[in-house]
Amino acid sequence: MAKKSEKLKKRRRRARRIFLTILILLSVSAFIVRLVAFETYFFSTDAMKPVYRKGDIAVMEKFEMLTENEVERGDVVLCAFESADTRLVRRVWGMPGDLIDVRDNQKFLIYKDDEGVMREKAMGNAPGLVYGTLPENAFLLLSDDLEADADDSRTLGLVYLTDITAEAGMILWPPSRMFRND
């Protein structure tokens, strides 16, 4: 009877050791993956509404080395605005070669869509932008909700390719919105 009890204790200790080893390995692996490939972002405003809302936490897929051809109009990216020493998630609207025009004290982004049709997007006053063509490796990033009082390229200026660090992905929190982007 004592032998069975001793064997049972040894099995439990061994199982506990294996469980702890697996738990530690999984934790270290998750930390490394997060450090290298992903990060999270907390949305503190409704500027990206309706897709991302205030209080959402989303996964950002980090870029290793980004080229101008990998950024597309409509991408939602995490970037560093040097002028404000801040990191924001915003949508790419203006691409290198697009034109910023001024008419009636309003600024407009003039660009060709995917079908080659000329389009324009009104941006209001936009004190951070000046008339002209967007230079190579420069992008115009805007909030989805242009009525929101939020910082973007209209107030902070253009973002350069080297300042774009990640692409927005799935919502982690709240769980009810995890697989929805509406």
Each predicted region: which residue ranges?
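Hydrophobic membrane-insertion alpha-helices, especially the h-region
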Residues: 17-36
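N-terminal active-site beta-alpha-beta segment that forms phosphate/nucleotide-binding
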Residues: 35-38, 42-43
